[in-house]
From Swiss-Prot:
<keyword id="KW-0206">Cytoskeleton</keyword>
<keyword id="KW-0132">Cell division</keyword>
<dbReference type="GO" id="GO:0005737">
    <property type="term" value="C:cytoplasm"/>
</dbReference>
<keyword id="KW-0813">Transport</keyword>
<dbReference type="GO" id="GO:0008017">
    <property type="term" value="F:microtubule binding"/>
</dbReference>
<protein>
    <recommendedName>
        <fullName>ADP-ribosylation factor-like protein 3</fullName>
    </recommendedName>
</protein>
<keyword id="KW-0519">Myristate</keyword>
<keyword id="KW-0449">Lipoprotein</keyword>
<dbReference type="GO" id="GO:0000281">
    <property type="term" value="P:mitotic cytokinesis"/>
</dbReference>
<keyword id="KW-0547">Nucleotide-binding</keyword>
<dbReference type="GO" id="GO:0030496">
    <property type="term" value="C:midbody"/>
</dbReference>
<dbReference type="GO" id="GO:0005634">
    <property type="term" value="C:nucleus"/>
</dbReference>
<keyword id="KW-0653">Protein transport</keyword>
<dbReference type="GO" id="GO:0005929">
    <property type="term" value="C:cilium"/>
</dbReference>
<keyword id="KW-0472">Membrane</keyword>
<dbReference type="InterPro" id="IPR044612">
    <property type="entry name" value="ARL2/3"/>
</dbReference>
<dbReference type="InterPro" id="IPR006689">
    <property type="entry name" value="Small_GTPase_ARF/SAR"/>
</dbReference>
Length: 182
């Protein structure tokens, strides 16, 4: 067996671990999203007081997803989880327009963090099942996502409740990790 075939085999092993940081304001749907990814019951979800970790298999990767609470008093502790992050997933409640400015400020601060420099970002425009939800394009414009030049990014409409759009977002995550590791 040649070196190339050994490398190919290593590349296709399902145990490539990916560290994903799942952040966003409280009540954005982070935990619901995580439970949806893990195919768990989403009927009884309470605010996350610390963090949840789940491992999910996807496209030959073991995605270790760290879901950190989004309450204002918890946000200063987010930086304790930045180390070795492969992908940042930022969840936004698309129906809570009153908090768009606050969520934009938090995202901007995250993008300025040195330990997250160059880390791909997926923004989930969540709660698209609600009639009052802003479309992903409007959110992208409001957050000035088009000005991000130091990393790859994607905005994905989704509903963590129904699961719609969630897999599309995770497919992008896996593609980004693959591209980064080549």
């Amino acid at each position: 067996m040649g070196l190339l075939s050994i490398l190919r085999k290593l590349k296709s092993t399902p145990d490539q671990e990916v560290r994903i940081l799942l952040l966003g304001l409280d009540n954005g749907g982070k935990t619901t999203l995580l439970k949806q990814l893990a195919s768990e019951d989403i009927t009884h979800i309470t605010p996350t007081q610390g963090f949840n970790i789940k491992s999910v298999q996807s496209q030959g990767f073991k995605l270790n997803v760290w879901d950190i609470g989004g309450q204002r008093k918890i946000r200063p502790y987010w930086r304790n989880y930045f180390e070795n992050t492969d992908v940042l997933i930022y969840v936004i409640d698309s129906a809570d327009r009153k908090r768009f400015e606050e969520t934009g400020q938090e995202l901007a601060e995250l993008l300025d963090e040195e330990k997250l420099s160059g880390v791909p970002v997926l923004v989930f425009a969540n709660k698209q099942d609600l009639l009052t939800a802003a479309p992903a394009s409007e959110i992208a414009e409001g957050l000035n996502l088009h000005t991000i030049r130091d990393r790859v990014w994607q905005i994905q409409s989704c509903s963590a409740l129904t699961g719609e759009g969630v897999q599309d977002g995770m497919n992008w995550v896996c593609k980004s990790v693959n591209a980064k590791r080549k």
